[in-house]
From Swiss-Prot:
This is Zinc metalloproteinase-disintegrin-like VAP1. Ca(2+) 1 binds at residues 405, 408, 410, 412, 415, 418. Its cofactor is Zn(2+). The N-terminus is blocked. Expressed by the venom gland. The keyword tRNA-binding does not apply.
Length: 610
């Protein structure tokens, strides 16, 4: 039996009320002074790390005892996290700091099922927690030789600017395409699998030169501000089955790389172009957000492209560092990321409970950590229509360049399993303290793993999804269920298509995906537009020039569909977005003639594309 020594760090425990104090969050008119008491369970003789994986604090709020349980946010950083800043002479300096022993936590209040907490424990406790439906902020009072903290409500912070802040997004963005509603029964198997898959957003943050000046030319202060913000964003998106990890941070500590200006529209366009032409070539990521110290025109606090995620030119947003309270800035950033993920502004009928929601057009003074029913529908319909691929990519072991972090749910180099922290792990096969398999276990997860043992050879582990797929079986030597599919070129869907990498791409399904249920393929005459070599019709691009289709290849260019809707009687319709010109082209492997399929904009023998 492991002996456990309960280490308690006790200070004065009596709270008292204060009338007014100037804190990092601003001038607070009504606050309560508390002295958090830390209670930590350590194995006897163990060395206490600087920041434990789990911590517990006790203090009183309004005279009532509160127990705050905290767990390290181990998914906060990606394995290849990097930081870039610039020397006074403009040299780029990029480092890969060890971030596994960070001080950022999520948590809950004991005996309060609806409670939440996002806390930095770097220098005392700083952040917010929800208690009995009320949102409180906590931060150290920074008194000499004292562990005193202030606990207060946001409403008691004096406002620097009474004018409400707004998001600048309107529905006239070129990147926005109206999304037709799709019921569950209309989903293709591929769309359903996509919806069910866990999503990952690799986030890159940039702080402009004014931010650097605002925080006293102190790189650590800017870095801390950014970390605090991401620590709030990650649990907001966890509820949407999206894991947000910070892959990189860049601080423009010498001069701005773009002309940051008070026109939010112009600044967003310039930032997005810089990301596409500069940042992406240096650091792989899915989404970038600029945090700026400039004041945008009017009440605008942020701006983002609607539906821009995974798009080279448009997966970006900008946010003004408009409040001393970091969680309000974090909500603004989560809001702009929401636009990138296909969510529009909430209407009056949208709800997420009693408080304002993340996608409200006006940024609320109240904490908004939930997405409304409308936002969830917007996001779902966006995913069904566009199926952005970058957010499906879970980091691979081979991507890891910094030390593996046991407890972050990612199986990395040197680990056999990773089931989370010792407190949350429920996997009988995995030792959460070492991320190694328990004695006698062959595996911890995988479709060919059953009760910690490999399933027998020949056991079916995945049924065939469709006629282009094959039933997959276990080898008896691995927990993995290797995906196999029918040979390419095999006829499918009543000879309307040919199997291509496990799928049966046919034009009819592609029209439905683009225009909704009821859409059909246009008549052959419509496809003759593909001989013009413009954005309405072409077969492929060479050096950014649209190449017209040859007569025999017209069905391997733009896809022409008939939506078959009361408001659209045009027999020849294409899906066109200037932000993603390739979307709406006939997919590779699609049947274009008898025994022929599309490959690189040409209609070739069915065996050629493979």
């Amino acid at each position: 039996m492991i002996q456990v020594l309960l280490v308690t760090i006790s200070l004065a425990v009596f709270p008292y009320q204060g009338s007014s104090v100037i804190l990092e969050s601003g001038n607070v008119n009504d606050y309560e002074v508390v002295y958090p008491r830390k209670v930590t369970a350590l194995p006897k003789g163990a060395v206490q790390p600087k920041y434990e994986d789990a911590m517990q604090y006790e203090f009183k709020v309004n005279g009532e005892p509160v127990v705050l349980h905290l767990e390290k946010n181990k998914g906060l950083f990606s394995e290849d996290y990097s930081e870039t800043h610039y020397s006074p002479d403009g040299r780029e300096i990029t480092t890969y700091p060890p971030v596994e022993d960070h001080c950022y936590y999520h948590g809950r209040i004991e005996n309060d099922a609806d409670s939440t907490a996002s806390i930095s424990a770097c220098n005392g406790l700083k952040g917010h927690f929800k208690l009995q439906g009320e949102m409180y902020l906590i931060e150290p009072l920074k008194l000499p030789d004292s562990e005193a903290h202030a606990v207060f409500k946001y409403e008691n912070v004096e406002k620097e600017d009474e004018a409400p802040k707004m998001c600048g997004v309107t529905q006239n963005w070129e990147s926005y395409e109206p999304i037709k509603k799709a019921s569950q029964s209309n989903l293709t198997p591929e769309q359903q699998r996509y919806l069910n898959a866990k999503k990952y957003v690799k986030l890159f943050l940039v702080a402009d030169y004014i931010m650097y000046l605002k925080y006293g030319r102190n790189l650590t202060a800017v870095r801390t501000r950014m970390y605090d913000i991401v620590n709030v964003i990650t649990p907001i998106y966890h509820r949407m089955n999206i894991h947000v990890a910070l892959v990189g941070l860049e601080i423009w500590s010498n001069t701005d790389k773009i002309i940051v200006q008070s026109s939010a529209d112009v600044t967003l366009d310039l930032f997005a172009k810089w990301r596409a032409t500069d940042l992406l070539s240096r650091k792989s990521h899915d989404n970038a957000q600029l945090l700026t110290g400039i004041n945008f025109n009017g009440p605008t606090a942020g701006l983002g492209y609607l539906g821009g995620i995974c798009n080279t030119m448009y997966s970006a947003g900008i946010v003004q560092d408009h409040s001393k309270i970091h969680h309000l800035v974090a909500i603004a950033m989560a809001h702009e990321m929401g636009h990138n993920l296909g969510m529009d502004h909430d209407k009056d009928t949208c709800t997420c409970g009693t408080r304002p929601c993340v996608m409200a057009g006006a940024l609320s003074c109240e904490a908004s950590f939930l997405f409304s029913d409308c936002s969830q529908k917007d996001h779902r319909e966006f995913l069904i229509k566009n199926m952005p691929q970058c957010i499906l990519k879970k980091p691979l072991k081979t991507d890891v360049v910094s030390p593996a972090v046991c407890g972050n749910y990612f199986v990395e180099v040197g680990e056999e399993c990773d089931c989370g922290s010792p407190r949350t792990c429920r996997d009988p096969c995995c030792d959460a303290t070492t991320c190694k398999l328990r004695q006698g276990a062959q595996c911890a997860e995988g479709l060919c793993c059953d009760q910690c043992r490999f399933k027998g050879a020949g056991t079916e582990c995945r049924a065939a999804k469709d006629e282009c797929d094959m039933a997959d079986v276990c080898t008896g030597r691995s927990a993995e269920c290797t995906d196999r599919f029918q040979r390419n070129g095999q006829p499918c869907k009543n000879n309307n298509g040919y199997c291509y990498n496990g799928k049966c791409p046919i034009m009819a399904d592609q029209c439905i995906a683009l225009f909704g249920p009821g859409a059909t393929v246009s008549q052959d005459a419509c496809f003759q537009f593909n001989r013009e070599g413009n954005h309405y019709g072409y077969c492929r691009k060479e050096q950014n020039t649209k190449i017209a289709c040859e007569p025999q290849d017209v069905k391997c260019g733009r896809l022409y569909c008939f939506p078959n809707s009361p408001e659209n009687k045009n027999p020849c319709n294409i899906y066109y977005s200037p932000n993603d010109e390739d979307k709406g082209m006939v997919l590779p492997g699609t049947k274009c003639a008898d025994r022929k399929a599309c490959s690189n904009g040409q209609c070739v023998d069915v065996t050629t594309p493979y």
